[in-house]
Each structure stands twice: as C-alpha cells, then as structure tokens.
Regions:
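Acidic, low-complexity/disordered segments
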Residues: 1-7, 16-20, 93-107, 114, ...
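Beta-strand-rich assembly/attachment modules of structural machines
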Residues: 1-105, 113, 173-209
Length: 386
C-alpha cells in the first residue's frame, strides 16, 4: 500500500514555499474527508510533546494559521487545503486561532434599516495588511434600525477586533492544576471554504455552467478546472442590500439542482485549487466485495487516490437487478452512489453512500421528538485496505 506524506506550505497569498514535512508527526493522526459537493472538504491532525518538541508546536501555532496543507501520494496531490483552526493547550490553558468567519474578517460593511422599509448599506472597510497576508475575507453585518453613524461605528469595531486571526484564551482553567506538556489540535478545510469569503450581490439568471464559471471567477484562490456544459436555467437572487449570498453557498445550490433531465451533478475544488463541475457517472466505477473496494479489473486502488462521486456495484448484494422498465445503473439495487470518501492513517478508507433509508429514519425520529430536521446521516461502508 502506498503511504501518503503530509506537507506544510506557505499561505496562498504568496508563493506557497515548502515549510515542513509533517508526515512523521501529523501522519499518525491524519484524517481527511472529500465530498461530491465540495471536493476536498476537511482534514485534521493532532500534535503533542510526545512526538514533537514544545518549541516547534508553539511555533506552528504562532505561524501556520492560513497556510496550505497537502497530502501527497506518489508525488501527486490527493488532498489540499489550508489550516483553518488551531487549538493549543499549554499548562492546562487553551488558546485558539481560527479563520472562522465570525471571528476573522478583514473587509466589512453593514446593511441596516435607515427608515421603515428602507435598507441601506455602508461602504466596504478593509484592513489591507490583513487581507494581503491571509486573503480577502468579506463580512456583511445585517443590522436592524440604525443611523449611518451607528452602522459605521459597528464596521470600525469589527475591523479593529476581527481583521487578524489573533490568539484567544478560551474555556475554563482549573486553578491549582499543575498540568504539564503541550498539545495542538489542527483543523484544515479545503479551498472550497474560501469561496464563502466573498459575496455575490447581483440578480442574475443564466445557464448553470455559465453562472458556475462566473462565480468561480470571483474567487481569490480557486480557478475553473473542468466545467461541463449544463444549460439548466438557474438564478442568483441577490442585491447590495437584500439577500446577500456567499459564493460557495450559491455554487452548492446550483450543483444540487442537477439538470433538465433529472440527472445528478457534482462539483468541488480539487488539486491545484481547480473547481470541477460535471454530471455524475451513469455506470459503476468500482465494486464492493467482502469489505474491499475494487476496480472493474478487480484490483484494489490506492486508498488516497479514491475520490467521491462514483457508482459502486456491491457484488455481495442480495438483489442484483433493476426494476422493470429501466436500465439505469441508478435504479439497480446492487449499485450505490458514493458521495463522500474519508481516509485516515489509523482507519484506512471508508465511503458514504447517498441513500434515503437513513434519512427517513432520522426524519421519523425528529418528527416524533417535535424537532425540525437540519441534517441527515447516510449509510457508511468501511473499506479494508490490503
């Protein structure tokens, strides 16, 4: 089995020089997820004074937020993102640095009610030093009734407080607890997350693939890769003062609409920060047999090379024929659509199917408890790696 390596690079606002090979220390706890709607989605790893010097851990905490992380397999990028959140524990006290948009934003404006039924927007205010270093992170604060002076004051306060991913002490501290040792929890996100650093504030109707290209073109870091033509008419209903929508959210909404023939589409940001948009496959790519994932040639792929958005035939399924009147692989009970792939150095490869059974069970439970559904679980299959 090919073992991946984990590497730290500089920030994407610069030339991204190679900083450090983290394979020996981060590789022990490395875990990452790729999804058919987002591409490279998330990753995480832990460091402690058991496997890295305390000074190096603290240096990473102080220096690496917003830096690029890559998983390489045989020299090829098989996951890529940036360090999003870091949680350092020293002497029992937790310190946090994060790029979460509620905590870090360097370009801000406010939208407020200046009169009954009248929404007004301030001009953008930007800390260019922060955006030059980390990328432009827009934030629109939606207010209630306010004066122009009050809205401007809120914008100024947000820029002063949140333009930089500063370190903050969080949580509780047990007084008298003489904790020793240093640990660091690192959470990474794929570059799809940076698409939500910018808003789209135009009212546009266009073909799906055309609007996808337009939206991706507004990104600071992501560029268009393979964009298949989709003539479905879609709409972005935004304005400067109403219904401001983040670019990433709009892209996901378009992908989920599919096409005029009812086909499933998929997309996301992959290697090289390239955005893909394509129709989901109509035939199976892999087979499942006794916990193993196999190619159609019955060989096992490298676990880190497997990407979501494929059909898999279960060779152990009790039913192997589609219902009468259809020859679509999507209707074959022995074939499932894999929407998410997870790989970890400790657990290997697992795939998650898009399926209605688990969704219905959750929906029934939420109806019974009186709560509204916000998310759904899907069935997960664990792959055994040879």
């Amino acid at each position: 089995m090919i073992t991946p390596s984990i590497h730290l690079y500089g920030r994407p606002t610069g030339a991204e020089p190679h900083w450090k090979d983290l394979t020996q220390v981060a590789g022990r706890s490395w875990k990452r997820v790729t999804h058919r709607l987002y591409g490279y989605l998330s990753a995480s790893f832990d460091l402690s004074s058991d496997n890295m010097s305390e000074s190096e851990i603290i240096w990473l905490y102080n220096s690496a937020i917003g830096c690029t992380i890559r998983e390489l397999t045989a020299g090829m990028t098989t996951w890529e993102g940036l360090i999003w959140d870091m949680r350092l524990i020293v002497g029992g006290v937790q310190y946090v640095r994060t790029l979460d948009s509620e905590w870090t934003h360097n370009k801000v404006k406010a939208v407020y009610s200046s009169d009954i039924g009248l929404r007004t927007a301030t001009a953008w205010t930007e800390n260019t030093d922060a955006s030059d270093e980390y990328g432009e992170m827009q934030y629109i604060d939606s207010m209630g009734g306010a004066t122009a002076e009050g809205a401007a004051a809120l914008v100024a306060r947000r820029i002063a407080e949140h333009a930089w991913p500063r370190s903050r002490m969080t949580g509780s501290v047990a007084i008298g607890n003489r904790s020793s040792g240093v640990s660091l929890q690192v959470t990474c996100v794929g570059y799809y997350a940076t698409l939500n650093w910018r808003y789209y504030t135009a009212n546009t109707t266009a073909a799906a693939s055309s609007l996808i290209s337009t939206l991706v073109g507004l990104s600071e870091f992501v560029t268009a890769g393979r964009i298949e033509t989709n003539a479905l008419s879609v709409r972005a209903n935004s304005s400067d003062t109403e219904r401001q929508q983040r670019i990433g959210d709009l892209l996901t909404h378009i992908i989920e609409q599919g096409d005029t023939s009812g086909n499933v589409w998929q997309g996301g940001v992959y290697a090289g920060k390239k955005f893909r948009y394509e129709q989901a496959p109509t035939d199976y790519t892999y087979a499942l047999q006794r916990g193993r994932l196999l190619t159609r040639g019955m060989s096992e792929p490298a676990p880190t090379m497997v990407e979501p958005g494929f059909l898999a035939r279960n060779l152990d399924a009790p039913m192997g024929y589609p219902p009468h009147g259809t020859d679509s692989a999507w209707d074959d009970p022995a074939i499932g659509y894999v929407e998410q792939v997870e790989y970890s150095t400790s657990g290997g490869l697992s795939v998650q199917f898009l399926g209605a059974e688990a969704q219905m069970a959750i929906l029934q439970a939420q109806i019974a408890s009186g709560s509204l559904p916000r998310s759904t679980n899907k069935s997960t299959n664990k792959m055994r790696n040879a």
